Amino acid sequence: MEMDIKDKKLFLLDMDGTIYLDDRLFDGVGDFLEKVRENGGRYIFMTNNSSKSASDYIAKLATMGIKAGERDFVTSADAVTDGLTEIYGSPSSAGKIYLIGTGSFAAQLVKDGFTITDQPEEDVDILLCGFDRELTYKKLEDGCRLLLGKRGRSIGFFASNPDLVCPVEFGYVPDCGSICGMIETATGRKPLYFGKPAPRMAEMAMQRTGFSREETLLIGDRLYTDIACGVNAKIDSCFVLSGEGTLKDLETSRWQPAIVAEDIRVLLSRM
C-alpha cells in the first residue's frame, strides 16, 4: 500500500535541487508550504549546504517570496556543531579548528563557541571541511600538511557533508565530498561526515518540533544523502526528480524511498 501524505505533519525539505535551483524557486513550492501550514503541519528546510548560514538562507528565500525564520532550518553546519559537541563535550573543549569552508560557515562556528584558525602552523586539533565556494589551493595544501605532519594522526578530520556535486543552472559544481576526495587521495584519511546521510539532522528536526518518525516525511533529490538519511533515521522519504537524481539511479540504488515524484507539485496534488 502506498504511503498517504495526508498522514504526515513534519516535512523535511532539502533545498538545492528540491525547492530551487540557484535563484529560481520551483513552481508549486510556495503553494506546498502554505498547504502544510493550513493542515496544521510544520516544515523544516534541511540542507547539506554549509556554505551559507540560516540568516543567509532566510535572505535568499525572502527574495523568492518565502518567509522563514532561523527555527525553520537545520543545516549541515548545525549538525557539525551538534556532532563535535557530542564528541568533545563542548565547543571550547574541541581545541583549534582549521576550516576549509566559507566565511559564513566560520562565523557560525565562532558564534556557536568554537575556535577557528587560518594558520596551520598553530596547534590545530581539528581539520574541518565544508562546501567551500571560497576554496583555494592553499587551503587544500594546508589540510594535507596537517594530516600528514607529525601530529597528523592526532588531528580529527571531520566534514559537513559527502555530496559530490551541487546542482546549479548550468549543471553541477564540486561540493564538499569532492573537496574531501582530493584530500583523501593525497593523505589516505577519510573524514567523519555529520550531515546527511547520517540521521543526525533529521533527528534534530524531530526533536525540535516534537513530531514522531511516523508523522515525518523527508523530501530530497539525492539518493545517497537525502533518501539514505530517511532510511537511517527510520522515516519515510520522497525522491523528487527535480535535481541530481534520476530514475536510472533509483534502479540500482540501495536507498529506496517510500514514494517518487517528478517535483513538489506532485506532492501538493496529493495533499
Listing of model-derived features with the role each one plays in the protein:
Residues 2-13, 20-38, 52-74, 81-271:
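Asp-based, Mg2+/Mn2+-dependent phosphohydrolase catalytic module
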